[in-house]
Amino acid sequence: MADPPRFAAVDGRADLAEGERAVLDRWKSTDLFRRSLELRRDGRPYVFYEGPPTANGKPGIHHVLTRSFKDLFPRYMSMRGYAVARKGGWDTHGLPVELEVEKSLKISGKRQIEEFGVARFNELCRQSVERYIDEWEAMTERLGFWLDMKDPYRTYDGTYIESVWWSLKRLWDRDLLYQGYKVAPYCPRCQTSLSSHELSQGYQDDVVDPSVFVKFRLTGAEDVSLLAWTTTPWTLPGNVAVAVHPDATYVEVENRGQRLILARERLGILDGEHRITAEMRGGDLVGRTYEPLFTDLLPEGKAFLVLSAPELVSMEEGTGIVHTAAAYGEADLELCLREGVAVRHVVGLDGRFLEGQARYRGIFVKDADPQIIADLEAEGRLYKAGQVHHSYPFCWRCDTPLLYYALTSWFIRTTALKERLIENNRSVDWQPAHVRDGRMGNWLENLVDWNLSRSRYWGTPLPIWICPECDDRRCVGSAAELGLTAQDDLHKPHIDDVVLLCERCGGTMRRVPDVIDCWYDSGAMPYAQHHYPFENQDLFTRRHPADFICEAMDQTRGWFFSLLAESTLLFDKPAYRNVICTGLVLDKDGRKMSKRLGNIIDPAQTFAELGADATRWYFYSAVAPGSDYRVSPELIRDVVRRFVLTLWNTYKFFCEYARLDGYIPEQTAPGGSAGDRPELDRWCLARLAQCIDEVRTALDVYDATAATRTIELFVEDLSKWYVRRSRRRFWKSADVTDSDKRSAYDTLYTALETLARLIAPFMPFLAERLHRNLSGHETGAAAPGTPDSVHLTDYPEAMAGWRDPALVDEMARLRRLVEDGLGGREVAGLGVRQPLREATVHGRPLSPELEAIFADELNVKAVTYVAHGDDEHEGVTLDTVITDDLRLEGLVRNVSRKVNDLRKQADLALDDRIHLHVEADGDLRRAVETHREHLMAEVLATEIGFGRADVLREWSGKIGGEPCWLGVSR
């Protein structure tokens, strides 16, 4: 009794989605992820940081993009023998969580939160961040992203918070954490200031705002006004000064019955004719006073005068005179504090005008703009008004227009280490490379101190206690200093009940009410996930910095920055060595995805229909990181058609014939040196070696796009050149021990087995299916010690005996010559099935084996050569004279093709024999009779009968212009 086949039968349909579900089940049942970690436990560490998502929202297709890259490189490095820990984590604090809970409670704003109760509110926040954990874990698992989600870090854990407190205490001790009164981006809806990196994430383009030119009447001058410009009319009630450039030239003009002063360079903004009546330097205006625009809430102290501020004045826009509202502009506040000018607020923390501002009290500032403009016009203070289209910041979470608002906040003095931050950034390898000195570098060059404090509730409490009696201040660096442990709830409001004894005066110290920026939380994950320095000091040292991180491009001013800043401030080194920044995910027409447009792609549905592997491969191969991705089911299907099916059909071809012939790779020692194999086989192994080398080189520099495209080219060569050129070697009836047939099997097996390992980091499911069948695990015929998963194998390395660059080049030359010859056939109107007598190569001779391939590809009987200069200008000419014998041979080749089409339609097995029935006359019948034996061998016919009969499948038409009927039966 014959042994069962070594290889399981392969379905003609790849059916990625169904196959992936089966692979997932096997991974779970065999605990494969844990086993893979255990296998490499003693390897050299490779450190990957998972940027923590917030699980109070469902994962989207853009998360699939980043998680595809996050999985690729840890898998690759693991197969190279590295120990790759992959700890998951959750970002649990901050405004995004609070806003979600507010919506669920149908409340809005801090007053209603406090009425509801901070303790209850924060408990709901804690529950909210776990709302979609199941969906996130399901997506992560279905994608094939191996991540340890059983023991994740959470930024709300007491151990995590305690590590963050430790870091802030270190900054405090070095005078890098301070309290300051500054103008900062401020959200009136959330009633908290924001950091500059949060600000950068909320800019909206083409925002329409008012553009107004306002007249400030000089005192002591007869109806002369300083002309200033602003796009924020709501700040005009808070005006306390105007600024000029002391060295610029200013002019007094008569224009439309008005006397105005502005910079000479800005005269172009005037409407109508004007006449210059006087000229002066900006310095001559400094110290002059003017009448306030509004008399409500007048400031106490010095105000309403012209200040010298060259750093504030631009001659590119406006009038050269700058309206200054100290409480609503960062540079404005610095100028006024320097000059001793009064600082006053006319707007409350809710973004509405204060009670004392009679005309506008209770009105939200942006809503007050039209009324302010109308009042200015009515009082003769408006020169002209219009609109401006510009970029403006909105709250990155609630989408409210931000205000620049002066208030007391706590800051990290990041500017003190600006140069070190820049140096550390330059040591990082960025993908794309331009991010280092571009987006990230520019951000660091314009660095400001980090606005750390938030006037909110659900976050890491700022660990600073202040004595109200003597203003003594203390920063706490551990829970133990408070008589607590990391297992206690360290959040508001519980932590607010903790009081300390003031060592200076004996008073009672109370904690400042603020929490910290949640981006500081996420940037703390390298050390806080390990509860460093309270434990795991050695573990942290081994896992810092990271070898690799990946997130979307906008994280240059989010997580990438917070990681770099904290690591530099605390450890004087970058937090990571290699970064991949992914671009935006757009629809197929290049539009952003939104519910309104109905173009959102659901990851779960995409995986169910097309498979995770195809989605992953699309993201790796479509564009280089940093570019925007156009995504649609059709584009992902193209990956299946273009690459997956080509590979699958090659794999299926091998398995079908290997099952027929009983091929067993262990008995024929695949791999190793190419030795004395046929030249085509040696070329295949040489191309495989080249592919391996190029893929490893690309992955070593984090270039997934180059790696995938290299693999695609090899698979195309394997299918459309090697397998097509080798088909007859598999078809022939010789036993598998025949040296030529065995070499073909060995070569194709080696290529496919290697490809399974080569694509494993990219397409973990498909690679697993190929590996398990090719290794014999699917049929229970695997050799002892053979890994039962491709993810427990080593990543391919090219064997030295495979490399043959000269042969690779020569085969490429051969294929160029074939293309040239086929072009000649096309010009002559001669199909390739029509044999020709001779082809002449104008260039150096091919080797005998390659010449045979060349002749067969062009279907010529002989090849001759004419000496030529160089390979680049080689060419092929054909003898296009068709003799009677050549014509008959061409006719029978066309018959053979039609019959093999009928075999496929009849769903016959590869080795099924048939009866061939032919109805034809003239030259066509003569061709069949002349080449009868050849035709029978080509179509596996036991006999050929002339005339019609009952058949399984039939075809009728013309061949070579002559009527013909063909039928096949068993």
Q: Where are the language model's segments positioned?
A:
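Amphipathic alpha-helical
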Residues: 24, 172-200, 204, 270-271, ...
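Structured, non-catalytic alpha/beta "coupling" segments that mediate domain-domain communication
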Residues: 85, 237-289, 383-414, 640-666, ...
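Metal-dependent nuclease catalytic cores in nucleic-acid-processing enzymes
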Residues: 68-85, 330-341, 373-376, 556-572, ...
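Conserved short loop/turn motifs at secondary-structure junctions
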Residues: 12, 62, 89-90, 121-125, ...
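N-terminal, positively charged nucleic-acid-binding surface of large information/translation enzymes
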Residues: 2-256, 325-338, 342-357, 381-421, ...
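Catalytic alpha/beta core of large soluble enzyme barrels
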Residues: 238-240, 244-348, 377, 418, ...
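Feature 926 captures the class I aminoacyl-tRNA synthetase adenylation module centered on the KMSKS loop
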Residues: 213, 442-520, 524-526, 532-534, ...
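Phosphate/diphosphate-binding loops
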Residues: 367-392, 817-820
